[in-house]
Amino acid sequence: MAHCSTTAPFVDAMPASPQVTPAESEVVEVDEANDRPWVTVVWDDPVNLMHYVTYIFQKLFGYSKARATELMMQVHSEGKAVVSSGSRDKVENDVRKLHAAGLWATMQRDSS
């Protein structure tokens, strides 16, 4: 007497997934803007005195008096200066601190 199996033979229930490859004409472009760091820009204003702006740059960013004065003069003469750079979170925090000190500041991606 032959042995009868009551179970069906093993069948792979999962169909083989098709191999998906990108077409040769597809080119993935990297958004270079996403690779650039963020910068904090301080803008000239008619309210804050130059020595106060210099003091704030020293206090918030640890700049020497000479470097803080140089940045302050750039704000005064060119209308703006980049005073810090880094991650978005860091720059957002720097902008908040500058606003708390009464300075006009914004953030943007580094343009260089």
UniProtKB/Swiss-Prot annotation:
Subunit: Binds to the N-terminal domain of the chaperone ClpA.
Gene name, Swiss-Prot/TrEMBL: clpS
Function of the molecule: Involved in the modulation of the specificity of the ClpAP-mediated ATP-dependent protein degradation.
Family: Belongs to the ClpS family.
HAMAP family the record matches: ClpS
Protein name (database record): ATP-dependent Clp protease adapter protein ClpS
One record GO biological process: protein catabolic process
Superkingdom: Bacteria
Entries under Pfam families matching the protein: ClpS
